[in-house]
Amino acid sequence: IAIVGVFFFALQYAAQAGWSAGIKRIPLAFGSWLPIAGILMLVSFFVFGHDLFHWTHHDLYDTTSHEFDSIINAKKAYFFWPLSEHPSTPVFFIARMLFFFGLWYYLFTKLRKLAFQEDLEGGTASWYNMRKLSAVFLIIFAVTSSIAAWDWVMSIDTHWFSTMFGWYVFASWWVTTLALITFITIHLKEKGLLSIVNENHLHDIGKFVFAFSVFWAYIWFSQFLLIYYANIPEETIYFVERWNNDQYGIIFFVNLFLNFVLPFLLLMPRDAKRHTAILKVVTPIVIFGHWIDFYLMITPGTLKENGGYGLVEFGTMLIYGGAFL
């Protein structure tokens, strides 16, 4: 959400959009979470890495061990280079994580500085500089966000891969961020702030939530259909573990309902996207729905059939959500 908020901000300048002038500082503020997120990611990896990522177990690369895995061994350079001949510390993986967060935060601070200059000095110089930097940011984001999705999510199921996974994760990030921007905009407006924001602005951002919920469903179905129709065991196992499982089977369909069916039906009428009462109901559901989506991406790969959902899962979500806000 932090980096996609900055993406939303940069997109407005690259596209020369004017409608979002009253709300663009909300997603820009999300970027302040980036250094905290980077620290939490590093701590989580060093503390829980062996539990989260199967590829971190050294026996998988030892040809004399009964745990040796030829498929994972073929990918060791992606994680351990330049120590790939003697895998111990995943230097390349950690370096990418540090590089991504460092680069994202650097670009965020540059955009924020230019935004403040535009407010203080006026004129068009800062605007043109922001537009150029935003275009650069969008290109960098396109590459780094996809690789981050491979590293932090897809590598949990180390044997499995999907060429659409970067797009799929981005779609989930994007819809969640749009829903949060909408919810915070409504909250601030009801508190007497953002007087410039009217029903037309809510309608525009509501259309974004509606349209990209459909986009998420399109990417989900495209990935699912290709794998289902090809019926290659190495690929179908990803969905089998989530569909034919007592722990995840129900959530599999709840995910589709919350992230596509519900927002599609509730936000289809024009008036629904213009009134705060409906948007205040739909957007938290969408945010929670995409938390469910990431739960399905991560938990079956780490806990297998031992996964569940209870106070720990929901409590963690509330703690991180509260800290972010």
Task: Pin down the residues of each PLM region.
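Alpha-helical transmembrane segments
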Residues: G18-A21, L194-N198, Y238-E241, L265-L279, ...
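Long, contiguous internal "core" modules enriched in hydrophobic/ aromatic residues
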Residues: F68-S70, K75-V254, A272
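TerminUS-proximal long segments
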Residues: T64-K75, L258-P263, L267-L325
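Juxtamembrane/interface segments at transmembrane-helix termini
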Residues: L11-K24, H54, R112-Q117, D157-T158, ...
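Transmembrane-helix bundle segments that line or gate the permeation/cavity pathway
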Residues: A2-L120, S134-F137
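Non-cytosolic membrane-interface motifs at loop->transmembrane helix junctions
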Residues: I23-R25, D157-F170, L303-G315
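Cytoplasmic juxtamembrane interface segments
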Residues: F7-F30, L180-N200, F253-F260
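Hydrophobic alpha-helical membrane-insertion segments
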Residues: G31-G49, A211-W220, V281-G289
